[in-house]
From Swiss-Prot:
InterPro entries, per the entry: Ribosomal_uL5, Ribosomal_uL5_bac-type, Ribosomal_uL5_C, Ribosomal_uL5_CS, Ribosomal_uL5_dom_sf, Ribosomal_uL5_N
Top-level taxonomic group: Bacteria
Alphabetized Gene3D superfamilies for the sequence: 3.30.1440.10
GO terms, biological process: translation
Quaternary structure, from the entry: Part of the 50S ribosomal subunit; part of the 5S rRNA/L5/L18/L25 subcomplex. Contacts the 5S rRNA and the P site tRNA. Forms a bridge to the 30S subunit in the 70S ribosome.
Gene name, Swiss-Prot/TrEMBL: rplE
UniProt name for this protein: Large ribosomal subunit protein uL5
Family matches, as PANTHER family: 60S RIBOSOMAL PROTEIN L11-RELATED
């Protein structure tokens, strides 16, 4: 479980200090949290399907997911205030490292024709966002128990000062990026 955290402390931290010439140990980039979210859209109309999505995300994350509700009514989207619009879970500490380890070593290699994650997902502040098309790549998910397949957004929030540091941190952890750039 803590394989990734040990790897970070033993080999990644010193590599980051050496590459970016970091003097203050508090400025060494570290992953703060991982947020997994699903915008339910049409799925939100059926309470049973929405609960199934929440259960699936909870199973994948290893932590209970919360159903997010609309803050405002938007007539164009046919959404009222308080209407369920998605599911999300925020992972920190041990759960975060366990999820990242599972994502990198088990789930992503199971994706058909996977060539790596795009490098365009960095936001300029050292955070990385990417989407997955379906949840079936995770070993916990049983195909028979899914009412409808759905994708998910994954945000990796780091303390990196810029995208270059964040990208190097994620590369050293083992996130498979596409070749180039």
């Amino acid at each position: 479980m803590m394989r990734l955290k040990e790897k970070y402390n033993q080999s990644i931290k010193p590599a980051l200090v050496k590459e970016f010439d970091i003097k203050n140990p508090m400025l060494i980039p570290v992953i703060e949290k991982v947020v997994i979210s699903v915008g339910a859209g049409e799925l939100a109309k059926d309470q049973k399907v929405l609960q199934n999505v929440a259960d699936t995300i909870s199973l994948i994350a290893g932590q209970k997911a919360v159903i997010t509700k609309a803050k405002k009514s938007v007539a164009g989207f046919k959404v009222r205030e308080g209407f369920p619009v998605g599911v999300m879970v925020t992972l920190r500490k041990e759960n975060m490292y366990a999820f990242l380890d599972k994502l990198i070593s088990i789930a992503l290699p199971r994706v058909k024709d996977f060539r790596g994650l795009s490098r365009d997902g960095f936001d300029g502040r050292g955070n990385y966002n990417f989407g997955l098309d379906e949840q079936l790549m995770f070993p916990e998910v049983e195909y028979d128990k899914i009412l409808r397949t759905h994708g998910m957004n994954i945000s990796i929030v780091t303390t990196a000062q810029n995208d270059k540091q964040a990208q190097k941190l994620l590369e050293l952890i083992g996130v498979p990026f596409t070749k180039g750039k």
